[in-house]
Amino acid sequence: MALDILIVDDEQDIRDLVSGVLDDEGYGTRTAASADEALAALDERLPSLILLDVWLRGSSMDGIELLRAIKLRDPQIPVIVFSGHGNIDTAVAAIGHG
């Protein structure tokens, strides 16, 4: 069975690109444009892996806050946090939350 990967990013182009590449490699993907959509996807089915953008513009919480919420639901879900606008403080915060 293929890994189920949840891609969380506010930019449609990024979601489409990452999802397309992973789908072509045989992975199952779902996407979410906001923290609320991501949490709803978790309620539906826990993924094998989450790819999470740090900056979720227009969302009820940013990526670090969403990471905390994800880890409260299931601390075992692996999460890869990414951003085109990161800095050391953001990286330290992400590592600190799992």
What are these regions (language model features)?
Residues A2, L46-S48, L72-P78:
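His-Asp phosphorelay/catalytic-motif detector in bacterial-type signaling
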Residues L6, T31-L49, R57:
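Acidic, metal-coordinating helix/loop segments flanking the phosphotransfer/catalytic sites
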Residues I88-V92:
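Receiver (REC) domain alpha4 helix and immediately following alpha4-beta5 loop
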